[in-house]
Amino acid sequence: MNYRNKKLLELARELPCQQCGREDGTVVAAHSNQQRDGKGTGIKAHDFRIASLCFTCHTDIDQGSTLTKDQRREMWEWAHRKTMGEFFLRDLISIR
């Protein structure tokens, strides 16, 4: 069973796009497409494996034909690390 947390997904919308910096109202929690992160056929990855991405960057990473699979994976991983860092730096999440 994959980890689900609606509040974490909502927090992702509070950040600018972690790929391009846009704050255009289209930023969402973009889940990893990697099987190692819990992704399966018809199943999203764990909610802790998300990146705050705008519609354009999310589409480029999920379906971009101008990028290789490795480039898309690297872009998502970079945005994921930035997202997690911003959550802590902005005190949006903390360790109890």
Residue ranges and their predicted role:
Residues 25-41:
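Short recognition patches in nucleic-acid-associated and regulatory proteins
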Residues 2-30:
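Short cysteine-rich loop/turn motifs with clustered Cys
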Residues 21, 55-58:
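Cys/His-coordinated zinc-binding microdomains
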Residues 51:
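Active-site cofactor/substrate anionic-group-binding motifs, chiefly glycine-
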Residues 38-48, 59-96:
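Polybasic, low-complexity binding patches
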